[in-house]
Amino acid sequence: GLIFENHIIKALRKIDPEAQLAHLAYHNSIEAPSCVKPEEGIFLEFAPFFRTWDQPLKNRDAVGRDGKTTHGEFLRMLEDNLKVFPAETAQVLDYWMDDSLYSGWKKPQVQVPWHRDVFLSDLETYASYGIRNITAYAIYVDDYYVKTFGDISFVDDYGQGLLNYRAK
């Protein structure tokens, strides 16, 4: 992936010298690159897709949704990636509110199993690595969701968590 991304960023920077491109550390590409170094303008986007969201990342023994990868292993992969990519430009893409995921990519969707304490703990964990940029999906949280479940307070929790978020 990084070889291809390096070619893309070189082409983009011919048009826009300030162009940025994410290296998506996700699923099969979550291990840190070891042979290829990123070109200027490539930043880390860490997306621990197979983690579990009923326990915080700091619970290193928690086993992810794949039944084998622990949160400790996800954190090790994050640490390894941060040896290649600077924390200052790194971004986390997490799935705390991704109802498409929780619903198995089928509608009608289920209610988001929101764990505010897990979310806030995860923010602290990411902050401890110096990561300043946090994003999340909220797919399937739509008009049907609001009509069916009513409570979308997790969106406010997410916003307040980010408002108060500070990288360390």
Predicted segments, located by residue:
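Catalytic-core regions of glycoside hydrolase
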Residues: G1-A167
